[in-house]
Amino acid sequence: MRTVGVHSEVGKLRTVMVCRPSLAHQRLTPGNCHDLLFDDVIWVHEAQKDHYDFVLKMEERGVEVLELHDLLSDTLIDAEARKFVLDRRVAPNVMGSQIAELMRPWMEEMDSRRLAAFLIGGISIADLPEGQGKALMASAFHSTQFVLPPIPNTLFQRDPSCWIYNGVTCNPMFWPARRAETLIQRAVYKFHPSFKGAAFDIWWGDSDEQFANATMEGGDVMPIGDGILLVGMGERTTYQAVGQVAKALFKAGAATRVIGCLMPKSRAAMHLDTVFTFCDRDVVTLFADVVDQIRCYSLFPLDDEGNFEVRQEDRPMLEVVAEALGVDKLRTIATGGNTYEAEREQWDDGNNVVALEPGVVVAYDRNTYTNTLLRKAGIEVITIRGSELGRGRGGGHCMTCPIWREPTD
């Protein structure tokens, strides 16, 4: 049975989920990348090499790395799992009733590895076999048009689900272009053999309902230990979602405090982890221009039903987090360089590091000023190339979904 649960941001990382660059990224163009919520086209071959290097460096430190294409492929061998995904992805509301009826038999018979590649990489009219209404669709649309859009942001596994102590959320995401990612996570957690028998709760989000204004993404969510959860509320995560997650955690006794961090809404600070991440139990790297503007609200449980009270915090975020963790003061490493360099390095994910254990982080090599400051503070910085992977606006923290992380001492 697989061990799961994330009990801190910097405890020993045991198991993590990633998604390598693949077909979805080969299909990015200057004309479609923004519709697919990817900032730029990437040199896929080089991005694959750099991602493989990232995986190897984690494995060298004893981390078990699970890859989403492989997990999904194994999951889709199960007929019930395949039906679960296709019922929701190959549906009239997604691709039209006639196209869905034509494609469903073809996809039901498809090899699971190929099906997994298409579910992540998308299906264009040109991919369809002859006789599947292909000629009619090709005459009406361009052959490169997608009947099932690719989801290239699967590269950033932090967002569609997040493990919080002994359970997980399957996150209703802010932009429609990313919501298919969550369906894949739901299928893996429900049906993959290594998760099917594991003991864990799904705190929230495992539903086909319309979540309306309740959206959440994992880049905003940090279980920092001792039953405390830090949640950014900026561009992508809303108070409507935070309240529901808090209630579920409090009802189960899984958390004692949820700290909501109200952030300015900006593309450069779309998630909390783009401006603030932990490097050690009491060490954080941050982009002060944004963090200094964050206002905090603490949620505390009132009863066994998960009802809670909300208290506005009058102190700066760093003081609130330090008090919650029981430390006198957080040691901070700000984005390095002068004003121009700091803004560039934050944009290039200089503060988006992932800890493999206390005091050891993975960072992009290009953020030389910030990495130097981290090393001077006693943090071991393992670097990976960021010239291609970073074009999607996410670093090591964004690209990883911890499945099992130990608490800190």
From Swiss-Prot:
<keyword id="KW-0963">Cytoplasm</keyword>
<dbReference type="GO" id="GO:0019546">
    <property type="term" value="P:arginine deiminase pathway"/>
</dbReference>
<keyword id="KW-0056">Arginine metabolism</keyword>
<dbReference type="GO" id="GO:0019547">
    <property type="term" value="P:arginine catabolic process to ornithine"/>
</dbReference>
<keyword id="KW-0614">Plasmid</keyword>
<dbReference type="GO" id="GO:0016990">
    <property type="term" value="F:arginine deiminase activity"/>
</dbReference>
<feature type="active site" description="Amidino-cysteine intermediate">
    <location>
        <position position="398"/>
    </location>
</feature>
<dbReference type="Pfam" id="PF02274">
    <property type="entry name" value="ADI"/>
</dbReference>
<dbReference type="GO" id="GO:0005737">
    <property type="term" value="C:cytoplasm"/>
</dbReference>
<comment type="pathway">
    <text>Amino-acid degradation; L-arginine degradation via ADI pathway; carbamoyl phosphate from L-arginine: step 1/2.</text>
</comment>
<protein>
    <recommendedName>
        <fullName>Arginine deiminase 1</fullName>
        <ecNumber>3.5.3.6</ecNumber>
    </recommendedName>
</protein>
<dbReference type="InterPro" id="IPR003876">
    <property type="entry name" value="Arg_deiminase"/>
</dbReference>
<comment type="similarity">
    <text>Belongs to the arginine deiminase family.</text>
</comment>
<keyword id="KW-0378">Hydrolase</keyword>
